[in-house]
Design a protein with these regions (language model features):
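Hydrophobic cores of alpha-helical transmembrane segments in multi-pass integral membrane proteins
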Residues: 7-34, 42-130, 144-169, 184-214, ...
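Acidic/Ser/Thr-rich, low-complexity mid-to-C-terminal regulatory regions of eukaryotic proteins
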Residues: 134-145
Length: 282
């Protein structure tokens, strides 16, 4: 990686803050010794919140520094996409972590997933990218914002799905003993998935309007658009199954994770192996 790029020190600093938040979150839920009392101080949660907020601010500075350096926002290359997603996922999770104390232990699931992106972005070169004329469109901003909300809500659902799955083992029951029952966690996870479906639907609509303005067609069934539709369909089917049948919590959690994996591949895989006209749901 080119260490001379202005955004790199800020990127490293932001990821370091996320790493500290991850380690503190894990330290906070893990029992210190056998027979430890069930009630523990939650002071560590304030440290996690502070580190996450700091990471979001530092990544915002990194994005701003790159914007000034290359003249456009982080919408084109995989390096830019990963950096902007690390910022938006962190921002939305900070808000959820702050407003919903009951889901805070799920940070030990969510933050390592974010660190997959963090490790990935550090392997890429921060070369300047070309900003195509089709991106000078106000609908692009709507499409981008809705997409970021969609992925962040999915990630919050994945955190709770991980709790449901890990509670099938003793270590998970000990780590997440302060969280509500599986029934409540499952309901909250699927509420996030319902919201994700709303934002996914709006994102596809905004993307279609943008495509009409940019390329003269609403939908072309290229690899990216097909993958995006299949993700939407998989999410809708998952919600239908969850609402129509008595699904065991283990299966429920696996469905949520499967939906996220498909969305992850659509965001970070398909755009870069497809000859589609645009780079993806940035």
């Amino acid at each position: 990686m080119n260490s001379l790029a202005a955004e790199i020190p800020w990127l490293w600093a932001g990821l370091t803050a996320y790493l500290v938040a991850t380690l503190v979150a894990m330290w906070g839920v893990a029992p210190r010794y056998a027979g430890m009392p069930m009630v523990k101080t939650k002071r560590h949660e304030q440290i996690v919140l502070f580190c996450l907020m700091l990471g979001v601010v530092l990544l915002a500075i990194a994005i701003s520094a790159r914007w000034v350096r290359i003249g456009h926002g982080p919408w084109i290359s995989l390096f830019e996409l990963l950096m902007s997603q690390l910022w938006s996922l962190g921002l939305i999770f900070v808000l959820l972590y702050w407003r919903l104390p009951g889901l805070r232990p799920s940070a030990v699931i969510v933050l390592p997933v974010m660190w997959i992106l963090g490790s990935w972005v550090l392997t890429l070169e921060p070369e300047a990218s070309h900003f195509p004329a089709t991106y000078y469109n106000s609908w692009k901003w709507v499409h981008v914002g809705l997409g970021k909300m969609f992925l962040a809500l999915l990630l919050a659902g994945v955190g709770l799905a991980g709790v449901l799955i890990m509670r099938n083992w003793e270590i998970g029951r000990r780590w997440f003993r302060s969280m509500p029952s599986d029934v409540i966690v499952d309901r909250l996870a699927w509420r996030f998935m319902m919201l994700a479906l709303v934002f996914d639907s709006l994102m596809l609509i905004a993307g279609a309007v943008w495509a009409q303005d940019a390329w003269g067609r609403y939908w072309a069934w290229d690899a990216l658009e097909t993958s995006a539709f299949l993700t939407w369909l998989f999410l809708a089917i998952g919600l239908h199954v969850r609402l129509s049948y008595r699904v065991p919590t283990m299966v429920s959690g696996l469905i949520i994770i499967g939906i996220f994996v498909m969305a992850f591949a659509t965001y970070f895989g398909t755009p870069y192996i497809s000859p589609a006209a645009h780079k993806g749901m940035v």
